[in-house]
Amino acid sequence: MTEMTLSANAITEIEKELEKYPADRKESAVMAALRIVQDEFRWVSKEIMQEIADLLEMPAIHVYEVATFYSMYEHKDVGQHKICVCTNISCQLCGSKKVLDHLKEKTGVGPGETTPDGRITIKEVECLGACGGAPMMQVGREYYENLTTESIDRILEGLD
């Protein structure tokens, strides 16, 4: 595995985020910094958390606490396309298990697994706040609601 380090582009983006906050409140940009890094690498390593801490002039443990509190931050490499299936009560009652079963049938992997080619990771997640459109899933930053096997097939076919 190659060593992860903040790229010049990531540092520039984080510095832009820092401009939104008072100079003595750099830690306010921690979530944005984690998002920027995850957008680049698809996950956030402990080494990168240390680099973020150094850049934001805050203890590394505070970056780690934020990164591990929120489920949106990955702590190991995930596939090029991360598919998050809501399995909270509304989605569960409306068929999230059928969604997961169909995804496994189509991709060959279940929750917490990544396809051998590194293309797709499937995750079970708690409520994504789209209960009215249950069952639903998130692919990247896009929400897909009122899922059927047919709509799931179209979504999978549309992934590059």
Where are these regions (language model features)?
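Signature of N-terminal electron-transfer/Fe-S-associated modules in redox systems
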Residues: M1-D160
